[in-house]
Swiss-Prot record:
Record-given protein name: dTTP/UTP pyrophosphatase
UniProt-listed Gene3D superfamilies: 3.90.950.10
Family according to the record: Belongs to the Maf family. YhdE subfamily.
Cofactor dependency: a divalent metal cation
GO molecular function: dTTP diphosphatase activity; UTP diphosphatase activity
Organism name: Bacillus velezensis (strain DSM 23117 / BGSC 10A6 / LMG 26770 / FZB42)
Its biological purpose: Nucleoside triphosphate pyrophosphatase that hydrolyzes dTTP and UTP. May have a dual role in cell division arrest and in preventing the incorporation of modified nucleotides into cellular nucleic acids.
GO biological process, one term: nucleotide metabolic process
Length: 189
């Protein structure tokens, strides 16, 4: 018997990406508090957050297969979260301007007796951005709910010079790796 699949996320981008697999699922947002542990690497932190999100939803739905995911943007060893205001968004975009950074997405798939967590890292390089470029992009309000203050799937694509890795991982869910991992839980596209 196939278990019910739950996406532990409110992210519209993750929902769109999971829809690509054309498998039935429901959404139950995880209510975990996202706190970084300064003693862990960015990869370890993003994996812990993905595991916490999936685990919290699994605790309330023990007969399900739960997917939790988290994405971080890192530059110079520092992780950039979602900006709190326009000024912080501008500061993040100035840091990313003309440089390469890493986007790390972790996915944790869990059942009551099994857990598989993996991490995917993609390198993204921005074009050099003028102050006008930054302010015009912030005016779109797109940066405000995204790690690193940009969305590669939207107008933020105009900031990107090059990407080395999985585009969908940058958006928030490495679809091909997720599909392969779900097969191990007998959930097939």
């Amino acid at each position: 018997m196939t278990k019910r699949l739950i996406l532990a996320s409110q992210s519209p981008r993750r929902k769109e990406l999971l829809n690509l697999l054309q498998i039935p699922y429901s959404i139950i947002a995880s209510r975990t508090e996202e706190k970084l542990n300064r003693n862990l690497s960015p990869e370890e932190n993003v994996q812990c957050l993905a595991e916490q999100k999936a685990g919290a939803v699994l605790a309330e739905n023990p007969d399900a297969v739960v997917i939790g995911a988290d994405t971080m943007v890192c530059i110079d060893g520092e992780c950039l979260g979602k900006p709190h205001d326009r000024e912080e968004a501008a500061h993040m975009l100035r840091r990313l301007s003309g440089r390469s950074h890493q986007v790390i997405t972790a996915v944790s798939i869990q059942t009551h007796d099994r857990k598989e967590t993996f991490c995917d890292t993609t390198e993204v390089t921005f074009w050099p951005l003028s102050e006008d470029d930054i302010q015009l992009y912030i005016e779109t309000k797109e940066p405000m709910d995204k790690a690193g203050a940009y969305g590669i799937q939207g107008k933020g694509a105009l900031l990107v010079k090059k990407i080395d890795g999985d585009f969908y991982s940058v958006v928030g869910l490495p679809v091909a790796k997720t599909m392969r991992a779900l097969k191990e839980f007998n959930i097939k596209a």
